[in-house]
């Protein structure tokens, strides 16, 4: 198997890392590379391209129909966008298409597999400390951990694992193949829950975890709940590589994706983080009080961004805490 065509669904911070890494191959005409988009989003991409680390890239923009039959589909969407994109994914995938989801959380592969079949899905994750600025997406190529992927069961060095390795090997994309991809995905999930969420409530950079015993206590509480659920599901997090217990190197001012979303007035992926853990906790009979509080706090911050608590001009309206 040789990968000669790649479609990226989702041209945000994660999708831009893949686009950046494969752009030289596309420019050399050794790879067909396109971003899947429709309507106004497609028009913006055609007009403005994607600005990555200060450089503007103009990828091909494909409809799902035009992307049908690509060798590799990279799904790099926000969690809330996935349900609306499942029809597009079904359209894109042919008998030969391999699908890699680089989305956060632990269930995007299952949701995609339910639509196209598990045989198409090559489990994967990405660790890239990218962020949006006024001039596009920025990340540090050197400190980025990159893409980790692998088969759930033997043979671990399958044809498609080798094909993806060959695709990434002579690019700037950092990658690693693992025989413990399920544990690696859950290890990243643990990082997201414990490191993304407390700082989002506080509104402070990641330095808060080392500078505040109180924020660390919240992070540790979230971690204990997640690890209890993982253990109940038979997931041995100790099998994840040591490098997977931490994220990419960042300054103490860094703001991870959940806080970036709140800063920008966007809704977050909290349903995929604490929301998923609350659901699994109920199914397994495991209490999740730290995640329940965190879930409702971040939902309330979303409501605040939506203007729900704008009481301008209501000074004379009596009310009380209920």
Regions found by a protein language model. Give the residues of each.
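Short, well-ordered alpha-helices that flank and scaffold nucleotide-derived cofactor binding pockets
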Residues: 20-24, 87-91, 114, 275, ...
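Rossmann-like NAD(P)(H) cofactor-binding subdomain of soluble oxidoreductases
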Residues: 53-138
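Internal alpha-helical scaffold of NAD(P)-dependent oxidoreductase catalytic cores
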Residues: 25, 62, 91-92, 115-120, ...
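NAD(P)-dependent Rossmann-like dehydrogenase/reductase catalytic/cofactor-binding core
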Residues: 2, 162, 169, 208, ...
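Nucleotide donor/acceptor-binding cores
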Residues: 3-4, 31, 71, 119, ...
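A structural signal for isolated positions on well-ordered beta-strands in alpha/beta enzyme cores
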Residues: 7, 32-34, 100, 148, ...
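NAD(P)+-binding Rossmann beta1-loop-alpha1 motif at the extreme N-terminus of oxidoreductases
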Residues: 1-58
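Short, charged/polar "capping" segments at the starts of alpha-helices
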Residues: 41-46, 109-110, 157
């Amino acid at each position: 198997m040789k990968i000669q065509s790649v479609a990226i669904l989702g041209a945000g911070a994660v999708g831009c890392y893949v686009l950046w890494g494969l752009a030289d191959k596309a420019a050399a005409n050794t790879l067909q590379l396109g971003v899947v988009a429709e309507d106004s989003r497609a028009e913006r991409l055609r007009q403005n391209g994607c600005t990555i680390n200060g450089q503007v890239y103009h990828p091909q923009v494909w409809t799902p129909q035009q992307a049908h039959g690509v060798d590799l589909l990279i799904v790099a969407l926000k969690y809330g966008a996935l349900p609306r994109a499942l029809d597009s994914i079904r359209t894109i995938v042919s008998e030969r298409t391999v699908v890699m989801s680089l989305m956060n959380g632990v269930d995007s592969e299952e949701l995609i597999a339910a639509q196209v079949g598990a045989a198409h899905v090559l489990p994967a994750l990405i660790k890239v400390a990218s962020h949006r600025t006024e001039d596009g997406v920025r990340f540090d190529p050197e400190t980025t951990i990159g893409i980790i992927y692998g088969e759930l069961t033997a043979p671990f060095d399958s044809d498609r694992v080798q094909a993806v390795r060959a695709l990434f090997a002579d690019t700037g994309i950092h990658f690693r193949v693992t025989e413990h991809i399920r544990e690696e995905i859950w290890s990243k999930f643990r990082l997201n829950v414990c490191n993304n969420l407390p700082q989002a409530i506080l509104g402070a950079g990641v330095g808060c975890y080392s500078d505040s015993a109180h924020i660390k206590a919240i992070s540790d509480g979230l971690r204990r709940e997640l690890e209890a659920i993982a253990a109940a599901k038979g997931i041995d997090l100790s099998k994840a590589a040591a490098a997977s217990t931490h994220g990419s190197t960042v300054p103490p001012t860094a703001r991870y994706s959940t806080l970036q979303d709140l800063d920008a007035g966007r809704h977050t992926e909290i349903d995929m983080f604490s929301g998923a853990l609350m659901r699994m906790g109920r199914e397994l009979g495991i209490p999740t009080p730290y995640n329940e509080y965190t879930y409702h706090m971040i939902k309330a911050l979303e409501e605040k961004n939506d203007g729900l608590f704008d009481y301008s001009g209501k000074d004379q309206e009596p009310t009380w805490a209920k």
